[in-house]
Amino acid sequence: MKRLIAIAAVAAVLGTGSLAYAGSLGRPCTDAGQDKWLAVEALRGKLLALGYTVRKGKLKNACGEFYAIDKAGNHVELFVDPTNGNIVGTL
């Protein structure tokens, strides 16, 4: 029983650590002002041209944040520089 509790405690600690960064790159994708950013639809178009199927997207914390499916069928979260559409991170 003690072993089960210890395993559950370790799993809980490890699980919450990864949640802190889930849905966030942890840093801005650009330091350019919002007047230099592309619209969400323009960023979406760039991702479509790269072969992603985009499900949802938004601008958040100086990043374009997109939920998509890649060419291999994997669900990915993409972080995009809003000034040029370059992918700067994935989860």
Ranges and model annotations:
Residues 20-30:
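Cleaved targeting-peptide boundary
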Residues 30-54:
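Short, non-transmembrane alpha-helical segments in secretory-pathway proteins
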Residues 47, 60, 66-69, 79-80:
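Conserved histidines in hydrophobic membrane contexts and catalytic metal-binding motifs
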Residues 71-73:
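Glycine-centered tight beta-turn/hairpin loop motif at sheet-sheet or coil-to-beta transitions
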Residues 54-60:
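Surface-exposed patches in mature extracellular/periplasmic domains of secreted proteins
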Residues 1-21:
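Classic N-terminal secretory signal peptides
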Residues 76-89:
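A short, surface-exposed beta-strand/turn
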